[in-house]
Amino acid sequence: MKGLILVGGYGTRLRPLTLTLPKPLVEFGNKPMILHQVESLAAAGVKDIVLAVNYRPEVMIETLKKYEEKYGVNITFSVETEPLGTAGPLKLAEEILCKDDTPFFVLNSDVICDYPFAELAEFHKKNNAEATIVATKVEEPSKYGVIVHKQGTSKIDRFVEKPVEFVGNRINAGIYILNPSVVDLIDLRPTSIEKETFPQLAARESLYSFDLEGYWMDVGQPKDFLSGTCLYLSSLSKKNPEALVPTSEPYVTGGNVLVDPTAKISPQAKIGPNVVIGPGAVIGEGARLSRCVVLANSTIKPHAFVKNSIIGWNGRVGRWARIENVSVFGDDVEVKDEVYVNGGRVLPHKTISGNIEKPEIIM
């Protein structure tokens, strides 16, 4: 089988982290975001994976080529000379995606969930569909484009963008399985699969939706990255609890704590719930961490407080410092002792010596 991951562009919503690495290589749950998807595709029997990229492909090629042998897949980079939207990349990769008549998966690189690739393929085949969209239920459908089905079926009738009145609560989850014939509907230009291709398929009654069970999150911006981390850790606690630090560990409070084995943590620290600590990180005594991500080689000094924030690589948070309210630090940021940061977006290589009392970008 084949799969295409829409990697896309600059990752501006996740800056300042993406000033250092392309978004798919930023660690989510202590491994590059895109690796979650490559692993899941490989586990479902996918052998050919195409990455549609238009920003810094050389960094990704170097990193991802080493995963080919590990997962038994062929990874091809399809490099766009201009951004081609969500449908154009399929046409650009037509030679691989349409090399035989079997269907292929397409997914957005920002999406984190329990990827249901095997079940999706079975559903697609059973319904003799031309295209199948994974759908997820949301509490506030008025914020999204909503899927409307033909009554009593999983066949899609139409899409309603940000409906004022309730028409349904299922939205496009950014994961598809498509027959090669779908590529014939696409031109090699910047084009949207959601707005241009899917309505054509719905009109010929060959577009279906598959309901996703479990969690789903588009983690393309910091607050959603943190929410997605909580959902991922919660899923891990049910499906692979041995991956998490046991709650019997002295420093764990509240559970759902994921720590790289090379991190050094004081038994007198208080960590949790919903914390990820990367390789080489050092957490001092009395430090208090909750609902946060600490990336590789960062140091949280004694009695510092970090909540609802992302500490970038090689960061240093001083004694008794307080970091909260979706603060995001780029690479190599230092916060001095006793400094308060409230919602600061701090660019790489900065030193923060005074309080940041309201959310702002620190250049």
From Swiss-Prot:
It catalyses: alpha-D-mannose 1-phosphate + GTP + H(+) = GDP-alpha-D-mannose + diphosphate. The keyword Nucleotide-binding applies. It is found in: Cytoplasm. GO terms for cellular component: cytoplasm. One of its GO terms (molecular function) is GTP binding. Involved in cell wall synthesis where it is required for glycosylation. Involved in cell cycle progression through cell-size checkpoint. Belongs to the transferase hexapeptide repeat family. This is Mannose-1-phosphate guanyltransferase. It comes from Yarrowia lipolytica (strain CLIB 122 / E 150). The gene is MPG1.
